[in-house]
């Protein structure tokens, strides 16, 4: 059995991004659509920020968005590769599908993720709106980030 560090795969993710940025000047850009007051989105925004920064992706932090329209407009103007909707389970049924539809109507290539593990009912609603994925403690961090690197052309 060859010895190895358990962190090697994650180090490779980070190095791949750093090398790509050095070579192209471009990185995977993640826009956070933080909905509602700070206590409503902070925990999930912090979690997905750390999740994405494992691969050295650029996370675009921002102020809160009181309306879906403001969040959609800012996400589209950001030039991000992906938007992550951050809020609470109680507000997601109203907010998440609307943000997703608003983004996808103008830029169907932008990925839209939900911060958190949705209920079966919420997942059905969000999937129908075009939500691309869900990021929570149940997510496979390595596989998610690797897939995003592949989609960005880092391989």
Name each model feature, range by range.
Residues 97, 101-155:
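Peripheral docking tails and interdomain loops at the edges
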Residues 93-95:
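Extracytoplasmic/secreted cell-surface and envelope-processing proteins
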Residues 1-87, 91:
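Non-catalytic terminal/interface segments that mediate subunit docking, oligomerization
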């Amino acid at each position: 059995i060859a010895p190895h560090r358990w962190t090697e795969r994650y180090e490779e993710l980070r190095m791949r991004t750093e090398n790509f940025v050095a070579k192209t000047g471009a990185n995977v850009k993640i826009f956070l659509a933080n909905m509602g007051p700070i206590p409503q989105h902070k925990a999930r925004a912090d979690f997905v920020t750390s999740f994405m920064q494992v691969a050295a992706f650029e996370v675009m932090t921002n102020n809160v968005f009181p309306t879906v329209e403001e969040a959609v407009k800012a996400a589209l103007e950001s030039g991000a590769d992906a938007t992550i909707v951050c809020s609470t389970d109680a507000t997601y049924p109203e907010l998440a599908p609307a943000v997703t539809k608003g983004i996808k109507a103008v830029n169907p290539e932008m990925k839209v993720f939900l911060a958190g593990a949705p209920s079966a009912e919420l997942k059905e609603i969000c999937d129908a709106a075009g939500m691309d994925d869900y990021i929570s403690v149940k997510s496979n961090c390595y596989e998610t980030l690797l897939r995003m690197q592949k989609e960005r052309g880092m391989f």
